[in-house]
Regions:
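Beta1/beta-strand and adjacent pyrophosphate-binding region of the FAD-binding site
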Residues: 1-13, 165-174
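Core beta-strand elements of the Rossmann-like FAD/NAD(P) dinucleotide-binding domain
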Residues: 1-3, 122-130, 246-255, 290
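Short glycine-/small-residue-rich Rossmann-like dinucleotide-binding loops
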Residues: 11, 32, 136-137, 244, ...
Length: 450
């Protein structure tokens, strides 16, 4: 049987592409070697957010507040892992039903490409007009001695079966490292975070990273930025040697989590592979690789953020390109979120990035101290900062560190994508009392500078 499209990889990019292709009349086959849903559903976004939710609840009930006294509260790790697995199974079952309803052929096997029109799925050879690579990513390891020691783990290991720990060292202060640090701190684990760059969350606004470090330190997490991991050794516990401010120091723990980013999975070629940069495929404006009829979407594509919602949008547009119809998704503004407590989210560009692009920009900022909902929720101090073009007032970017930031950022993303100005946004009445009123205060601060 010859297909119009074979998709390799059944994560967010893969199954989204399958729905889009089959829904528009393309004979479609989806090949996945593991579980449908990919990293996001099985070893990433969904299990992490399940654990974050429980951690936030536990942090609340164990806190010393005047209105809530909960004695003998404890984390049931067995129950928490079961809850996580049930959520994964429920969501995976939904994907399976939708694929079946769409009459999409699903093959569970290791896929490799013989050429641009032939795919090997296990022992079976399949012919196709086009191939879409959605093979995703996996945890990247760092080249230091002792990395092979028992107890050195990745996010895959933690999210497969959450272990109870007395202490944990996390190498990497990015999104994954910070989210897991927050989870384990809430559960009573002694956490140490080692980050090589200047701030936590190096890919986001520096103020957010510095503010999160202050929150972490207040809660007892040891944070070491501008610090290099040197080596790992094992005796009764694991010991990490690290360099900080010219000195070599050590710290010990039950486990060491390597959270130093992710690398693309690209081992799917029996033929010549498409062009790559920094380990990821390069694509043109149609998401086509250097080899005609071979497309790519998701974490494996160079130049795009490794986010599930980005992957899904890329997949839809790649199928549009295959069908020779206009794109359905605008990838110029991609919101991102960090599920710490408080949450952090951003969309668009910062004032510094605007200046680097030759734009004259201003920013407005409001903190959460005077916000009624934040006070009611006993939130940590947070802020919302907006960046706008000085001449036109057009909103360019927003960063938030507050309750519900990952939900609130959608309003900012929509406004940036639609080219709305600060004054236009201020015409919209926001409810009271809501967390979103801090966004209004930030806009008002910006308007005074325009």
């Amino acid at each position: 049987m010859k297909y119009d499209l074979i998709i390799i990889g059944g994560g967010p990019a893969g199954y989204t592409a399958a729905f889009e292709a089959a829904g528009n009349g393309l004979k479609t086959c989806l090949i996945e070697k593991r579980d449908l849903g990919g990293t996001c559903l099985n070893r990433g976004c969904i299990p992490t957010k399940t654990l974050v939710h429980t951690a936030d609840l536990y942090r609340t009930v164990k806190g010393d507040t005047p209105d809530l006294k909960c004695a003998d509260t404890a984390v049931d790790y067995e129950g928490l892992n079961a809850k996580k697995e049930n959520i994964i199974l429920q969501l995976r079952g939904g994907i399976e039903k939708m694929l079946k309803a769409g009459k999409i052929d699903v093959i569970h096997a290791k896929a490799t490409m013989k050429d641009a029109h032939t795919v090997r799925a296990g022992e079976e050879l399949l012919e196709t007009e086009n191939i879409l690579l959605c093979t995703g990513s996996e945890p990247a390891m760092i080249p230091i001695s002792g990395i092979e020691c028992e107890g050195v783990i990745t996010s895959d290991d933690i999210l497969r079966d959450l272990p109870q720990m007395e202490d944990l060292i996390i190498i990497g202060g990015g999104v994954i490292g910070c989210e897991i640090a927050g989870i384990y701190e809430a559960f009573g684990t002694k956490v140490t975070v080692i980050e090589a760059l200047d701030n936590l969350l190096p890919g986001m606004d520096s103020e957010a990273g510095r503010s999160l470090a202050m929150v972490f330190k207040k809660r007892g997490i040891d944070v070491h930025c501008k610090t290099k991991a040197v080596s790992i050794s094992k005796d009764e516990k694991l010991t990490l040697a690290y360099e900080e401010k010219g000195e070599t120091k050590t710290v010990s723990a039950d486990h060491i989590l390597i959270a130093a980013g992710r690398k693309a999975v690209t081992d799917v070629f029996e033929c010549e592979a498409p062009s790559m940069e920094r380990g990821r495929f390069t694509v043109n404006e149609r998401f086509e690789t250097s080899i005609p009829h071979i497309y790519a979407a998701g974490d494996i594509v160079y130049g795009y953020p490794q986010l599930a919602h980005t992957a899904m949008a890329m997949a839809v547009n790649a199928v549009c390109a295959i069908r020779n119809v206009p794109f359905k998704r605008d990838l110029s503004v991609v919101p991102s979120g960090v599920y710490t407590c408080p949450e952090i989210a951003s969309a668009g560009i910062s004032e510094k990035e605007a200046a680097e692009k030759g734009m004259q920009a201003i920013s407005g900022k409001a903190n959460t101290l005077a916000n009624a909902r934040s006070l009611i929720a006993e939130s940590e101090r947070g802020f919302i900062k907006v960046t706008a073009e000085k001449e036109t007032g057009k909103l360019l970017g927003t960063v938030m560190m507050c309750e519900r930031a990952t939900d609130l950022i959608q309003e900012a993303a929509l406004a940036i994508e639609r080219g709305m100005t600060v004054s236009e946004l201020l015409q919209v009445i926001h409810g009271h009392p809501t967390f979103s009123e801090v966004f209004v205060s930030a806009l008002e601060a910006a308007e005074k500078k325009i």
